[in-house]
Amino acid sequence: MEVVIVPDAKAGGELIAEAMAALVRRKPDALLGVATGSTPLPIYEALAGKVRAGLVDASKARICQLDEYVGLPTGHPESYRAVVLREVVEPLGLSEASFMGPDGSAEDIVAACEAYDRALAEAGGVDLQLLGIGTDGHIGFNEPCSSLASRTRIKTLTEQTRVDNARFFDDDIDQVPHHVITQGIGTILDARHLVLLATGEGKAEAVAQTVEGPLSALVPASALQLHRHATVVVDEAAASKLKLADYFRHTYANKPAWQGL
């Protein structure tokens, strides 16, 4: 696992956007897994800026979803399908045909989960998966005590996650669904490159447990320790509880440029 400490969220977004752009230059039809929430917005803004400036041609890139609420009506503005189309697909100039995600409105949710895992495999696998992290260490919607071998499935949200997400529903927790479809930890680990971005002091403890704590289902993000190519990008506030912060700064400062992220 590589840990990169950046000054702020904007710097983290630019760094990751350039890594995504470099991937698309090497592999124009790369399958990019995206996350929702406020944390990755600087990434999407920076990547869209590169597309507009002609620095990368993303016209053949493909986008896939990490998770989806269960039970929101089709077209609900806070369904993750709608969010990804609005914040990622459209700004990159891509069509909806380039996008794939689980069906949270399906009658048979179990079948929809299995179908999404198959679709990801049939698409050749995810080349780069973006991740955020919850204050309790969850990734996707794999809450604490999720199986580290889990596949795409339905999960019940913790009350803390519902509280955290109420800001997207007019601060009304009653509007936040109780269930989601999420890629499992095992599904996430299938991606070729995992990139986790965390910003703010509120994420510092979760970051420290992920990077320096034991591998544990209590901290789902700690599964990144098992991945052959995992990158954790954090701002100074989110890095504030890392015991090895100085070491991480030193190794990144002396990293050969040709290695990339």
Regions found by a protein language model. Give the residues of each.
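N-terminal glycine-/serine-/threonine-rich phosphate-binding loop
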Residues: 1-32
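Glycine-rich N-terminal segment of FAD-binding domains in flavoprotein oxidoreductases
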Residues: 26-52
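A glycine-rich beta-strand to alpha-helix segment
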Residues: 30, 39, 43, 119-144
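Short beta-strand segments
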Residues: 33-37, 65, 102-103, 130-133, ...
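A glycine- and small-aliphatic-rich helix-loop capping segment at beta-alpha/alpha-beta transitions
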Residues: 46-57, 82, 144-154, 213
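Ligand-binding beta-strand-loop-alpha-helix segment within the catalytic cores
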Residues: 56-130, 246, 251-260
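Class I SAM-dependent methyltransferase SAM-binding "motif I" and its flanking Rossmann-like core
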Residues: 136, 140-185
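ATP/nucleoside-binding phosphotransfer catalytic cores, i.e., glycine-rich phosphate-binding loops
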Residues: 186, 190-261
